[in-house]
Amino acid sequence: MTDPTAKPKLGRTFWTLNIIEMWERLAFYNLRVMAPIYIMQADNPGGLHLSATDKGTIYAWWAIVQSFLPIVTGGLADRFGYKRTMAFSVFTIIAGYLCIAFMRDVPGVSNYWSFLTAILVLATGTAFFKPGIQGSLAHQLTKENSSVGWGVFYWVVNVGAFVGHFLPSLFLLKGWFGAPANSPEAWRNLFIASAAFSSLNLLLLLTFKDVPSGASKTEGIGAVLWRTLTNIAEPRLLAFIAIMSCFWLMMFQLWDLQPNFIADWVDSGPMARSLGWLPAGIRQSVIEQTPRGPMVPQNVLLSFNAFFIIIGVVGMSWLTRRMRTLSAMLIGMCMAIVGLLVAGWTQSAWILVLGVLGFSLGEMMTGPKKSEYLALIAPPGKKGLYLGYVNIPVGIGVFLGSWLAGTVYQRFGEKANLALRYIAEYTPMGQTKSWDGNMASLESTLGIPRTEAMARLQEFSGLDPVAATQLLWHTYHPHVIWLPFAAIGIVAAIALFIFGRMARKWSDMNA
């Protein structure tokens, strides 16, 4: 006889879905943690050397496709089946990684358009993947185990992310497969590896049966699209989406802007020297040689975000299992704001890691709860649809945040541009030029490309790379770029507090 008081267990399909998610995230973060460097870092020899504004535009369109397409694909996953949707998405994701690897070499196509086109193919695949796997997962969970279930899912996501943070060092620094370190060939191998990891999910999809969504299987595509649009027009749902959009605008800058900020400004030399006890092979994977001396790469520093979540998110989910989801999210928002400011206001790698800890604690409380909240308030037969809405705040936030970050960082934060600005404003050579104050015209005005900016500044000033970096830090204070993002996060927290108070009066939104 079944004990009616027994807690529902997490079954085999639940764990298979989590493994599929882990491989997808490992492949994704193998690319994502290095994409900011590949796109615009002036001192990386194998990168594309695009501008911060170009990067912002690419990230904005990436976010639009990856996060807004699930508005449609969530309903399609409910209609046509989660497993079929995931299979289509995996093939598209593999194609996206291969396009990133090889389209750079297509004659007559600029680096900007080749990367943008390839990344949109990848984004399309991801947009089909998310509603499929999250819809399948939601049907494996009940109200009694949803907090722990979503916490485990978030834990698995970060296992993939954590491993994905270290793989680039093997391909880029150690130069696997005979490619010189940080060369175009090494970057290509990195992207091919992501395609290979993604292909493993094709095998895993054969190991379980599809989960019935509960939605109509005879409904036409037009009706699915109409239902998708009419459901999202609910004013209270739109208010929640707007609040979370502001929060994700702030959050994503740790992953999208912080890599460039670390590469430009953070001094991880003391941390690198403290790792001298590591075996030579491992040390070579977590320490890179830079003009400023041995440093810990930004992808390794930011891996602490995934590491902290791996060791803490399941416990955090257990601690908050009886907490109202909106209340837990509010606390998490406040912690993330503090962490962002601590991580962004320093040149010390040790203090940055402390900020990442605060940021990660906030993410542990907010990230899983956003999915749990929408799954709990979703009407029957609409879990895939509502979980497709999870991505909308990310899309809006990353779209606006990418545009803002590109504009702000190009003018106030990028070291190569600030080096050119210093040459224009404070050196005899620069004072003979007629610069109009527009950062975009600095290269043409001075006749110095961004890739040579720091070398020329050192030549004019007589300073070494460390001293030249400090000169720019104290002259232009690039850490102020984090203030607008923190301010937007504070607005989101205040709005969520008000929404949470009002939701107590709505039985269908109070979760």
Regions of interest found by a model, annotated:
Residues 91-109, 334-347:
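C-terminal ends and interior cores of transmembrane alpha-helices
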Residues 128-142, 364-379:
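Intracellular juxtamembrane helix-capping segments at the cytosolic ends
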Residues 1-13, 142-147, 162-163, 168-269, ...:
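Intracellular loop-helix junctions on the cytosolic face of multi-pass helical membrane proteins
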Residues 22, 96, 110-129, 350-366:
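Hydrophobic core of transmembrane alpha-helices in multi-pass small-molecule transporters
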Residues 147-176, 194-198, 390-405, 409:
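Glycine-rich segments within core transmembrane alpha-helices of 12-TM secondary carriers
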Residues 56-75, 162, 303-316, 396:
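Central cavity-lining transmembrane alpha-helices of secondary-active solute carriers
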Residues 33-54, 256-297:
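Short amphipathic helix-loop junctions that connect adjacent transmembrane helices
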